[in-house]
Design a protein with these regions (language model features):
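Switch II (G3) loop of P-loop NTPases
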Residues: 29-37, 192-198
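A short, aliphatic-rich alpha-helical micro-motif
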Residues: 24, 43, 76, 242-243, ...
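Short beta-strand-centered segment that lines the nucleotide-binding/catalytic pocket of NTP-utilizing
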Residues: 10-21
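ATP-dependent carboxylate-amine ligase
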Residues: 97-100, 133, 156-178, 184-320
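Conserved acidic residues
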Residues: 28-29, 47, 81, 246, ...
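Acidic, Mg2+-coordinating active-site environments of NTP-dependent enzymes
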Residues: 7-8, 48-192, 268-277, 290-294
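Inter-motif core of Ras-like GTPase G domains
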Residues: 45-55, 216-222
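Glycine-rich phosphate-binding P-loop
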Residues: 1-2
Length: 320
């Protein structure tokens, strides 16, 4: 989203976390998506360190929330111009910063604040106030509060680089989303969604967006955990969040999931906390089980290739 906002403002290069990107000579801006895993992001010394949130993850490397926060604090303070943070986060505002901090959010006390937020099946609309003054009213084809926060953060970056309201409203309204983030297929009266979500909070956001975007449809959610340490650490959280959908399903860890010392589990570490859930396989049998539902939104969530099961379900329903 940040790249999309900047690319028509001035020449902009981009590097996304999956290794893809775009570059041209003489670009003024370089937007890079960096990851905290194994402190990889400490190699970066950006002009702006833009941090959406802090929530414990990558538990095979980070052993405590204190260690996690220390890494983010160090990364943030490597910024040259400013640190841009979600001011409503329970952790970010309390870190020790040595550079200018600009906070965005919906709560009072943020430098960039969204007010009068409307979030429904038509999209998002909200007023943006900057240091107390109305900047403009945004109407965008996005869904969910998590998307509002992402958008507000990008608006903050644009403001810091001198963009005006008209440019940002126009440019953001044409943003089509990111790879493997809420990719929608509508076939008949059913909706199929592929999403990279792998942290419990990300799954929660996907479910919330679905309820907003497709009210009245039942939700069939399928999640495949990818790392044993993450599955073990967040087992109860996965179960609690998946319990909010009509029909919760899980797929076992992939066969190529990296082995981790001292951890010998399967997906039952999660499902035992949610007895009404079912386990399906990524084959025709699994597709038949899921295809029994109609007028539904099917959520397929995992960093792995669970979208292949989505394709099988669509084919199975076409047989009916």
């Amino acid at each position: 989203m940040a790249y999309h906002l900047f690319k028509d403002y001035d020449k902009t290069n981009v590097l996304i976390g999956d290794g893809t990107g775009y570059a041209t000579k003489g670009a003024k801006y370089f937007v890079a998506e960096c990851c905290e895993y194994k402190d990889h992001f400490l190699w970066y010394h950006p002009d702006y360190a833009y941090i959406n949130n802090i929530e414990m993850d990558h538990v095979d490397y980070f052993k405590s929330m204190e260690q996690y926060e220390q890494s983010f604090e160090k990364y943030a303070n490597q910024a040259k111009k400013a640190i841009v943070i979600w001011g409503d986060d329970p952790h970010l505002p309390h870190l020790n910063y040595t550079k200018r901090v600009v906070k965005f959010g919906v709560k009072d006390g943020n430098d960039i604040q969204a007010k009068n937020v409307i979030n429904n099946e038509k999209g998002l609309s909200f007023d943006v106030y900057i240091y107390g003054d109305l900047f403009g009213h945004f109407t965008l084809p996005f869904y969910g509060m998590h998307t509002l926060y992402n958008t507000l953060g990008v608006i903050t970056l644009g403001y810091l680089e001198g963009m005006d309201f008209d440019y940002m409203q126009s440019q953001l309204s044409t943003f089509k989303g990111t790879k493997r983030r809420y990719v929608v297929k509508e076939v008949g009266n059913n909706v199929y969604v592929d999403d990279y979500a792998h942290h419990p909070t990300a799954i929660k956001y996907v479910i919330e967006e679905t309820r907003t975007r497709f009210p009245g449809k039942q939700i069939v959610a399928v999640y495949q955990p990818d790392r044993y340490s993450r599955g073990l650490r967040f087992a109860k959280d996965y179960a609690r969040i998946m319990d909010t959908v009509d029909h919760p399903y899980f797929v076992d860890f992939p066969k190529n999931a990296p082995k981790e010392p001292g951890i010998d589990i399967d997906v039952s570490v999660i499902t035992k906390n949610l007895p009404r859930s079912k386990v399906v396989t990524e084959d025709e049998a699994g597709a038949k089980e899921l295809a029994q539902y109609d007028n539904a939104v099917f959520l397929f969530m995992s960093p792995k290739d669970i979208y292949k099961l989505e394709d099988l379900v669509i084919k199975e329903k076409e047989k009916a």
